[in-house]
Structure formats: structure tokens, C-alpha cells
């Protein structure tokens, strides 16, 4: 089922005894919500660019979303490319290699998820929150770079999950 409007959710996470509130906006990439989307880019600390691996058109819009992020978001904002619906791999229209390639082009991480089966959803949000918390409290505060030199996070901590974040390192 596709989103048919703007969906807004709050997700509360506790990390190291610190409460973190994530505001999650889902515009389903619809042009009619572009004004809303671009205004929220300005205050965002992280942007998850989500496409449907079973829908080529969805993937083809990634470049447009990245251009909007470059134009409207603050410099160094954490960006992650997310291929959703990995539970429907048999209907895949976008290969993992192709998705990794575009993520590499932008110097960001790539992960595949399934919102339906909640595959790596919690890992994605928790790791994003941990990264942001480290930049606010213990990090440089710039939001730029990590140990591997990219604007990204490493979700490879949980080796038991087969749909992990790909390092995209050359």
C-alpha cells in the first residue's frame, strides 16, 4: 500500500539514559508536498531518502531528492538511502548493486528495510539517533564524517540481521 498524503509520527527512543524524540515525516515523495518537505529539510538533523525497490520510478526520483537536500538542508546533514520492501525481493526492479552505486555517488550509506515486516526499521532509527546524539554530546558537533570519513552511520553492529546497512566503501 502506498502513502496517500503526509504521514507524521513521533518515535521516542532512550539511549544511554537520554530520551530522544524523533519526528518522522513521510511525504511519499509526492510533488504536491514539496513545499512542506523543503521547509523541513532546513531543520532536519537526518534525512532518510526512501525508495521502493519494487518501483523503478521511485528509485529514479532519488537524484531529485538529493538535489533538494543539497539545496535546502543544512550542510553536513546525515543522509541515508533506504530501499524499502525488501520482503518483496522477488518483485525487485532496482538491484542492490544499483542502489549501492548511487549511494556511493553521494557518499552516503545504503540499507534495505521492510516496513511491513519491520526488517531493520528499529536498527535504522536507533543507529541514526545514536549517531546524532554522539555528534551533539561527544562528537565535534558538525555532523560531518565518521570513522570511515563519510556522512553516515555504521549499522553493522547487529550481525544476526541479514538486511544490514551496506558499508559502500571502496
Model-identified regions with their sequence ranges:
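Switch I (effector-binding) loop of TRAFAC-class P-loop GTPase G-domains
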Residues: 1-19
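Generic detector of well-ordered alpha-helical packing
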Residues: 8, 27, 53, 85-88
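Conserved P-loop small GTPase signature centered on TRAFAC-class small GTPases
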Residues: 15-19, 73-170
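Switch II (G3) loop of P-loop NTPases
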Residues: 19-34
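Conserved beta-strand segments of the P-loop GTPase G domain that flank and frequently precede/overlap
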Residues: 24, 48-52, 81-84, 113
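Short, solvent-exposed loop/turn segments at secondary-structure junctions
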Residues: 31, 57, 88-90
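Short acidic active-site motifs
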Residues: 32, 36, 58, 98, ...
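Inter-motif core of Ras-like GTPase G domains
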Residues: 34-56, 62, 66-72
